Amino acid sequence: MASFLSPVPVLAAGGIADINPGLTLWTAITFLVMLVVLGKFAWGPIVKMLAERERSIREAIDSAKKERAEAERLLAAQKESLAKAQREAAELARRNQQEVEALRQELTAKARKEADELVAEARRQIAEELGKAKTELKAQVVDLAIDAASRLVKANLDEKAQRALVEEYIAQLPANRAA
């Protein structure tokens, strides 16, 4: 047993090629004992720990895949929601533009109608006033003619006297109108 604990001169007896059967046997026995001890006490916990680690890694990978799929689903839903909002905004803008155009046309038509009505009313009033003025003028002309005729009949003057009488009467006209 003392030879087991003593150092073996590897190079002294001929080098590495020399095999010592006792040392080989004890090395094999030690290896097998260590293998049995490790197998009985360490191998189970190591395998269990590796299995647990593998399970936790698989769960983490599965969880990451689920979260990624959920994130992609949410992203697609968000993109669809954004596209829908943009379509609705464009539709609302188009409808507002149509309403503004319709209102503009309605107001323009209403303004034209009111302007046409005002022009028609003004023309009617002008025609009425013109008719009144013509009637009044005719009445004044008739009065003037009657007055001039009565003066001519009373005076029975020659042409020169008649002309002077008419000119005098015409000169008095603005005074008659003001009165």
Swiss-Prot record:
S-S bonds: none
Full protein name: ATP synthase subunit b
One family name in Pfam for this protein: ATP-synt_B
Cellular-component GO terms for this entry: plasma membrane; proton-transporting ATP synthase complex
Gene symbol of the encoding locus: atpF
Family to which the UniProt record says this protein belongs: Belongs to the ATPase B chain family.
GO MF terms held by the record: proton-transporting ATP synthase activity, rotational mechanism; proton-transporting ATPase activity, rotational mechanism
Chief location: membrane
Subunit structure: F-type ATPases have 2 components, F(1) - the catalytic core - and F(0) - the membrane proton channel. F(1) has five subunits: alpha(3), beta(3), gamma(1), delta(1), epsilon(1). F(0) has three main subunits: a(1), b(2) and c(10-14). The alpha and beta chains form an alternating ring which encloses part of the gamma chain. F(1) is attached to F(0) by a central stalk formed by the gamma and epsilon chains, while a peripheral stalk is formed by the delta and b chains.
Function as written in the Swiss-Prot or TrEMBL entry: F(1)F(0) ATP synthase produces ATP from ADP in the presence of a proton or sodium gradient. F-type ATPases consist of two structural domains, F(1) containing the extramembraneous catalytic core and F(0) containing the membrane proton channel, linked together by a central stalk and a peripheral stalk. During catalysis, ATP synthesis in the catalytic domain of F(1) is coupled via a rotary mechanism of the central stalk subunits to proton translocation. Component of the F(0) channel, it forms part of the peripheral stalk, linking F(1) to F(0).
Protein topology in the membrane: Single-pass membrane protein
Location of this chain's protein in the cell: Cell inner membrane
Residue intervals passing through the bilayer: 27-47
NCBIfam families noted in UniProt: ATP_synt_b
Keywords carried by this UniProt record: ATP synthesis, Cell inner membrane, Cell membrane, CF(0), Hydrogen ion transport, Ion transport, Membrane, Transmembrane, Transmembrane helix, Transport
